Amino acid sequence: VRSADLAKHGFLAPASILTESAPLNSIKGNRGIEAIAVPPDDSAFGGSLVAIGERILLGGNHSGWVLSGNQSRRFKIRRRGDFDITDADFLPNGDLLILERRFSLILGSAVRIRRISAADFTPEGLATGMILDGLDLMTADLTHQIDNMEGMAVRVDPDGTPIILLISDDNMNFFQRTLLLEFALRPEEFGVIPPPRPAAETLPRG
């Protein structure tokens, strides 16, 4: 994994080795590292990077790593419902959000956002070998306005409301779409967010 300080040097920034982790170097194929997230500076893993595999399974569960300097620490996320992980980001309070996607010829496509509490995602918690799980913030299927949701980012409105942005990849296929979805995670709804619009509803253009 290489790191470059674009803020200081722009696109001419020299890249430097962030970690030489043997587990990451040995990952092959198209189900490798899919999500990279930066924890808040004041969180348990501030100053590190978190990398999670799309479908790197260990004992049937997803694998992720906390990368800090030349050190890496592996952790596990419980795999539920045949979903793969496509992205991740952190809320300001240190909770880890996981974007998951499922595609099945029988069940169709679905997307899910899970929230893993900062109280569980700690060096002490990972040292016990615990399997992280978390709460479902949102689950949607093809009855809603979704597609191949692969990207997620979190920003914060001036009033402090976390905004979750999701984007899909159409893979240059005529039967897929590029969608940008936005959700407000309000305090009174912190345990759940409503799913996207119904699929039968026409989206506005512009």
Task: Annotate each predicted stretch with a short phrase.
Residues 1-206:
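Sequence/structural signature of beta-propeller domains
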